[in-house]
Amino acid sequence: MPRTAKVATKLAACMLPVFYLAAALSAQPPSNSGSPPMNGIAHVAIRVQDLLASRAFYEKLGYQEAFALDNGGAPTEAFLKVNNTQFIELYPKHKPEEVIGFMHVCFASSSLEELNRYYASHGLEPTPVKRAGAGNLLFTMRGPEDQNIEFTQYMPGSKHTVDIGKHLGVDRISDEIIGVGIQMQNIAKAVEFYSGQMGFSRAAQQTHTDMFQIPGPSNQVVEISPKAADNRLQLILAVKDLKHTAEQLKQRGILSEKRNSKPILHDPDGNVIELKMAPMARDASQ
């Protein structure tokens, strides 16, 4: 065989793996980039009948009040700290028409402007990014059935950032909110909103068809459940040992019960707190 022919044959042989790789990649479905990644759940907000009673209950769970906001001396919001980046916000009821129970969930992002642009480009109507009362960046968006959704980016000098490392109760029953249940009348439309427009993905480790994973590395979830008359919150907390946690709660005068084999608690307004065994990456100092 002539030398030039041998060279051509060897070159073709060397190129075959490249061609096969290119063909394999082109045969794969295009990746769904989805929403820009988020850091997870920043807070859940609850309207409460009695702020003092609700705060006392959550303090029994080990959650200290990091700070509060007021209007002319009247309390408007209390921030109970789960970890350095997650809070339970309690809003006292001031008007008869205000509904007790779940108000909204807030997701944290390190690139709030990018997230805002993403939603706007997907037919949603996020409000402009602004600096909120606690000093962080914030925008909101109307979800299915006119439900409010918040998005925040923690900023240097904000009340949340200044409090890092503080108010981390050593007796917290959980160091992480790993999920929140959102009630909807039209489940199908809510599922389409969160998966189709917000870029949430079905939680791979779950069989529940209406449980979706928040974009990003948090492994936290949003569960879409049928609308109930009481509008109560469903909060999912990660614990390391269910039996030990139940014993701790009993010692503090808080009784748990089981629903669908899952241990749950009720706060003074009937909001549901579900305890779930889950590996927790953070330590007690976070």
Regions found by a protein language model. Name each.
Residues 65, 99-102, 161-163, 233-237, ...:
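A short, polar/proline- and glycine-enriched secondary-structure boundary/capping micro-motif
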Residues 1-8:
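N-terminal secretory signal peptides that target proteins for export/translocation
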Residues 10-24:
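Bacterial N-terminal signal peptides
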Residues 36-39, 45-87, 121, 129, ...:
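Core segments of cupin and vicinal oxygen chelate
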Residues 16, 33-35, 69, 79, ...:
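Residues embedded in well-ordered secondary-structure elements
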Residues 64-99, 148-156, 200-233, 268, ...:
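Conserved short beta-strand elements that form part of the metal-binding/catalytic scaffold
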Residues 28-35, 39-49, 78-81, 95-176, 181-182, 205-207, ...:
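Vicinal oxygen chelate
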